[in-house]
Structures are given as C-alpha cells and as structure tokens.
Amino acid sequence: MSFFKWVSFVLILHLLNPTLISCSSNGLSQIPSKFLTLAKRNDFFDWMVGIRRRIHENPELGYEEVETSKLVRAELEKMGVSYKYPVAVTGVVGYVGTGHAPFVALRADMDALAMQEMVEWEHKSKVPGKMHACGHDAHTTMLLGAAKLLKEHEEELQGTVVLVFQPAEEGGGGAKKIVEAGVLENVSAIFGLHVTNQLALGQVSSREGPMLAGSGFFKAKISGKGGHAALPQHTIDPILAASNVIVSLQHLVSREADPLDSQVVTVAKFEGGGAFNVIPDSVTIGGTFRAFSTKSFMQLKKRIEQVITRQASVNMCNATVDFIEEEKPFFPPTVNDKALHQFFKNVSGDMLGIENYVEMQPLMGSEDFSFYQQAIPGHFSFVGMQNKARSPMASPHSPYFEVNEELLPYGASLHASMATRYLLELKASTLNKSNKKDEL
C-alpha cells in the first residue's frame, strides 16, 4: 500500500474509531514533506526548469497566450491529464482525480508584461517589448509540476482537482472570464499563489481576511484651446488645468479618506503637447485607484470623476473621464477565507515548519484572483524565492526582475499538498457528519 493510500485508509478508519486520531493526523502531516521530496528529485526539478525557461523565452500578453497554452496542453497530454480548451479565450482547465465531486481548484496565471527585459542571460525573452516580469512563467510551471505530482498519485485523490491555467491577469481580468465560463461550478474552494523575493526561499506568507486592495484604472482627456506659448492670454491652457487636477486628486486620500482605511490614487500618465512653444488643444492623464473595501472604492471612483471634471471647469477647460472597465475591469479586494487560511497555515507548516510562515500586512497591490473569491471560498498566498547570493533582487514589474528557480519544487508541492489534503479532510468531515446523523 502506497504512503498516500495508507493516509486515506487510516483517515477513514479514524472516522469509525476515534482512537486512531493521532495516527491519521501524523499521516496527513507527512503529505506535504513527501510531495516536496518528490518535487526536489533531480529529474523532476530539471523538467520544471526546462518548462519555465521555454515559457520565459516566449512571453505572451493577456488573451494572446497561444503558444503558452499550447505548451501547457502538450505537457498535460504527456501526463495523461484531461483538459478543456479554449476557456476564457486562451485558458486551459485540467482535471485530475476521480472526475466526480468534491472538486477543489488550483490556479496559475500565464500572461506576461509589455516591457523589454534588461537581464542578460541565456534564456532572455526572445520577443521584443515583452517579458515575464511578474513570475507568471514560474506560476504556470509550478501548477504543471503539481499536476504531475497529483497524476502520479491520482488513485489516492478523494475527489477531483481542477487545474486552472488562466490568461490575462495583468489588468485583463482573465479570472472574471474563467468564472463566467462556469469553471468553478460545483468547486468547493480554490487556491492560488504568487512568487515573491521579499521572503527567503522556503518561507510563505499570507493573512486572513483583506489581503490585497481592489483596483481600477482611469484616463481623462482635458480639452482647452491651443495657441502660441508666447501668447497664453489667447489660449485656454489644458496643461495647467491638468496639473491642477493632479494636485487636487491627491486631496482625496489625504483629506477625505479615513487614515485607518487605506486608499491610493496615483496619476501615472501625462501626455500632451509636441513642441516647446505651442500650448496644445488637449492633454490626457491616466492612473489607478485602490481601496480595501467596495464602499471606499466606489466613493473614490465617484470623487475622481467629480474632481477631474470640476477642476477642469475652474480652468475653463472641458474634461471627459473613462474608467476603461471593458479593457481593464475593476478588481475586487482579495479577501482570504478564514477557514482556508488556517488550513493553509497547517499545510505549509507541515511542509516548511510553522516558523517559516510569515504573517503579512495588507498590500495595496491587486489580483484578479479576487473574482474567484467572490464566487467561492478562496485563499491566496506568497511563496519566497529570495536569493541571498544575488541580493537585492529586482521587484516585480521591473525589467530586471528574475526568478530563483530553486523555488519551483516548493510551489509545485505546496499546490499538490493543499489539493490532496483538502479533499482528504473534506471527505473525512463529510463522513463524520454522516456518522453523527446515523447516531441520532
């Protein structure tokens, strides 16, 4: 009898005989370390590194992940894992296990960013102006690694693991399209993770409740009357109006928001004019806004539009505001389920030691994983990859961003462990409730 089969067998026996609790608990606690050992095998590690580098060399933007999804499908086929494609344009959804309920989902995003890689190495991006600068190449690789681990122990799975290879996380709201496609129907829970160089290799971080902010984008066109820069009295200067708008927008957080309710409004784009001596007819500004509650988020949205249009009017200009929701949908706050967070701490603690769990503070960054959490219970976490030999490592969305490939076994085994343990514990809980009803 294999180790994983033994754990399942003992867990079910425990439900019939409570005296076996310590035995079943010990068996469950060994699953994560067993998976980590398997994922660290030289052949397994080298396979993951090869996949990650192939993806990194050929980055694709949101909803354009044609070759990436082709690679994912090819690897799933080699494993004998069934899948659906296309889902949400370029997404792939795989299935490992019994094919029946209960269902638990694991998610990885596949898209890259529109930036030129500046890191000089053998597997640098081959596509000009595109780069995996947020670790999504590693995320996809680790989920494929988890799929391989789970497939090797498919007979022991007490249900079905849904493998979500998602397109377009970077502003495209791919998760929303995955939900709309019905992928999460009958799924009990979903888990996602993200690489970070703010934690040491072998550490993980998360928190219960609000974790990442809700986010939205805006752009505004401010129109005046152009003319010669030497004769400003004959113009209506949109650059000056836009400058006043930007300053006024900063007051929304500093003077209108509760200091204990974290919010951000940032103007990150300003375009206007083409000559040193000509005042343009119009300028365009754009930016992002963030908040941890839906109420605060919608209030910011309302006030951003009011401030832009009214401040422009003060300067005798007209303004139109576009929140570009079709192109970049609003992301809700990422809020971790309480029970799933405790489950994550238990599993990661069994794998890495509870001392390697780091309680994180809320971040103003955003994640479209939140769309899943609006539909079903979900949990999001960070996996460390800090490389002390190459410290400091560049932050995500930097052209100098790098992934420490030593983290790949940790992410793959953590994914596989959470799915396996979740299904085992869910079955145990269901049987336990059934036994209690029979006793009544």
From Swiss-Prot:
Gene Ontology, cellular component aspect: endoplasmic reticulum; endoplasmic reticulum lumen; nucleus
Record's keyword terms, sorted: Endoplasmic reticulum, Hydrolase, Manganese, Metal-binding, Signal
Domain of life: Eukaryota
EC number(s) from the headed UniProt entry: 3.5.1.-, 3.5.1.127
GO molecular function, one term: IAA-Ala conjugate hydrolase activity
Cofactor: Mn(2+)
Signal peptide region: 1-23
Cofactor note: The Mn(2+) ion enhances activity.
Broadest EC class assigned to this enzyme: hydrolase
Keyword presence, Cell wall biogenesis/degradation: no
CDD domains tied to this protein: M20_IAA_Hyd
InterPro entries: Amidohydrolase, Bact_exopeptidase_dim_dom, ILR1-like_Hyd, Peptidase_M20, Peptidase_M20_dimer
Motif (Prevents secretion from ER): 437-440
Result of altering residue 230 to T: In iar3-3; reduces activity
SUPFAM superfamilies from the UniProt entry: Bacterial exopeptidase dimerisation domain, Zn-dependent exopeptidases
GO biological process: auxin metabolic process; response to wounding
Catalysis performed (reactions): a jasmonyl-L-amino acid + H2O = a jasmonate + an L-alpha-amino acid
Binding residue positions for Mn(2+) 2: 134, 136, 194
Family: Belongs to the peptidase M20 family.
Protein name in UniProt: IAA-amino acid hydrolase ILR1-like 4
Species of origin: Arabidopsis thaliana (Mouse-ear cress)
